[in-house]
Amino acid sequence: MKNHRSMHILICCYMLLYFGIGIKVDAVADSEASPVKGIPSYRASEEPPLYKTIESAKTYIVQHQNRDGGWPLVPGGESNVENTAFAIWGLIDAGWGTGSQVIRMGVMYLRNTQWDNGSWNNNTAHTVFALVALATAETDPEIRFKGLQWLKKAQNPTGAWGKKERSADNVLYTAAVLAGFRRLGFKQNFAPVSKGADWLAESINYDSGWALQRGTQSDIFVTSWVIQGLEPVYDIDAQIAWLKQLQNNDGGFGRYKNRPSDPEITAIAVMALAAGNDPLNTRRVSINYLTSIRQEDG
């Protein structure tokens, strides 16, 4: 695991482990033997590894909140919007109270960093993630409305979004915005969702995956975000099948086929599988991978 990405990876994995997969901490299935060779199983009388992972991650995240209320990419670094949004989102969905000091400080950071135009950093992904965090915290409707208006304005005539307002169409940023809209509850009848989904659908590769540049090798990370964004509008069964075929033997996912498993990519991939209501054990195998590679510090 790369140290300079550890905080971002942790938060992504934490989000995934607790709410993206739809598995309760006390699920009976947590006492089953691991289906992946090399990953240890455990007895029903022992504390489930998933529970340990979640609790350790919660503690680690809270301990590394900065004084300004935000969270950094790496402990001791400067706060940034993306990690702060993910931290708020994940903690609340894990049962952290919206009125707690930790959440209130995080919300304050997002409130203080919104730009006058309604965006966060003039960045479409940062903006939608901040909106999800504030909506999850059930606060600041006026700020959220202002951010939503900016996102609608930033959508290109093609239906896509770029990184910033009036920047070139980008598959990953379009997918991230649509995934955020999905979390916010917007459906096909919301024009930005249907237009954006149509643009993404037209950008598909021949193998049912997506890449940053159409026609290049399909990218598991990009495709996993796209799947989440398309789910409210399109049937994604073929994309779920494509994704499952690329899972590594250890249960994780790499960026491309046969590449080493990566925690962040695995987390995003399982969020995509959850969006597709995958009926098999693919998500479960990935969870075992993520719990097995957790560092001692949480």
Give the positions of each predicted feature.
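Mature N-terminal segment immediately following signal peptide/propeptide cleavage
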Residues: 57-63
